[in-house]
Amino acid sequence: MRKLYIASAISALVLSSLMFATPSRAAECIIAGELSPWGTNSTGTFMLPSGGSCVLNLRIPGVVNSSSVLQKPAHGSLRRVNVSNYEYRAGKGFKGTDTFSVTAVGKTAAGMTGKSVVTLNANIQ
């Protein structure tokens, strides 16, 4: 009887932790185009459904020291998650192209520093 009680308590604990778990962040954006090395600007394109969201990862080789939004999207929102990740959310009901830019400063593994502007074109379906 005691084993059954312990098993029930564990099951209840697991179930309650699943019920109150915070939702995971948006999926990563699949971007066509490659990020250039530090000091060079890049452009990329990705697709997303209207009202959808995804996380953009600044995968510039090396270390991202700082970043900021240079140009906000006109038809969606852009939220900084951390220094190298931004969440883009397309406006509900909008279909078309939304463009925005992020500036990043960092350095290569060899220690060379640079500033890059990453411009992204979101094709909203």
Which residues does each PLM region occupy?
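Extracellular/luminal low-complexity segments enriched in Ser/Thr/Pro
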Residues: N85-T97
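Bacterial N-terminal signal peptides that target proteins for export
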Residues: M1-S11, S17
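Surface-exposed or secretory-pathway low-complexity segments enriched in glycine-proline
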Residues: F46-S84
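C-terminal edge beta-strand
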Residues: A27-C29, T108-Q125
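Cleavable N-terminal signal peptides
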Residues: L13-V14, S24
